[in-house]
Amino acid sequence: MDIVLLVKAAVMGIVEGLTEFLPISSTGHLILAGSLLGFDDDKAKVFDIAIQTGAIFAVILVYWQKIHSTVVALPRQAKARRLALNVVIGFLPAVVLGLLFGKMIKAHLFIPVVVASTFIIGGFIILWAEKRPPGSVRIEHVDDMTMWDALKVGLVQCFAMIPGTSRSGSTIIGGMLLGLSRQAATDFSFFLAIPTLIGAGAYSLYKERALLSVADIPLFSVGLVFSFISAWLCVRWLLKYISTHDFIPFAWYRIAFGIVVLATAWTGTVVWAE
């Protein structure tokens, strides 16, 4: 296989890993990187599933101890059952809305003005969320969330169907605005990512199954490995970062990136569409 193509796969994997779990929208960055690298044909849709899988493996590894202890404790601990149920409840709204409106959103909202607007608006929402008064935090730990809290975060996650919004951004910042601490919102966002990304990937794999080829295994493997490594490093870094910092730098980054989207679309440098 062409070494240049493998290098492109590695770059795309790194972009996915670094952006999937930060509140900056992996979709927008993958579109930009794919367009600049010439890695944006139909096969790229299947490749996106591979690199997303690498990111899923990374977050599972980082949270493995918590996931394992929760699963083992399900028969005897109400706290474990509540967390598992909350993840399921938070996951369901995206499933329903995705099946009902997924095609329509991809057909009508994947345009530069929408992508740029969601980047910029999302940036200002982060700035607003970080200005919360100290007493607005109701929930310090993810285990203390109620089913109602989980449902509300799950509903907020549905906004991530709009390109440029960011799944992690919507759930983390949405959770904070709903009264979760920065740590609790981030933890629940990562737990929620596991079924959400697995479900979306499985559905996309089924839809694009005609594009699968054994010859592409090396390409997909490279992307998956680099996505896994970069996502693992990114998640570990973010968990340390939020213990002493806020999300304001990401807000300004989003606003700047939204301007980049408009500029590249206006000049024709990047084709912001599927």
UniProtKB/Swiss-Prot annotation:
Recorded catalytic activity of this chain's protein: di-trans,octa-cis-undecaprenyl diphosphate + H2O = di-trans,octa-cis-undecaprenyl phosphate + phosphate + H(+)
Bilayer topology: Multi-pass membrane protein
UniProt cross-references to PANTHER family, sorted A to Z: UNDECAPRENYL-DIPHOSPHATASE
Family: Belongs to the UppP family.
Enzyme class: hydrolase
Domain of life: Bacteria
Organism: Variovorax paradoxus (strain S110)
EC number: 3.6.1.27
GO CC term, one of those recorded: plasma membrane
Function, as annotated: Catalyzes the dephosphorylation of undecaprenyl diphosphate (UPP). Confers resistance to bacitracin.
An MF annotation (GO) of this entry: undecaprenyl-diphosphatase activity
Name of this chain's protein: Undecaprenyl-diphosphatase
Gene symbol of the encoding locus: uppP
InterPro entries tied to this protein: UppP
Note: Bacitracin is thought to be involved in the inhibition of peptidoglycan synthesis by sequestering undecaprenyl diphosphate, thereby reducing the pool of lipid carrier available.
Alphabetized UniProt keyword annotations: Antibiotic resistance, Cell inner membrane, Cell membrane, Cell shape, Cell wall biogenesis/degradation, Hydrolase, Membrane, Peptidoglycan synthesis, Transmembrane, Transmembrane helix
Stretches that traverse the bilayer: 44-64, 85-105, 109-129, 185-205, 214-234, 247-267
One example of a Gene Ontology biological process annotation: peptidoglycan biosynthetic process
Subcellular location(s) of the protein: Cell inner membrane
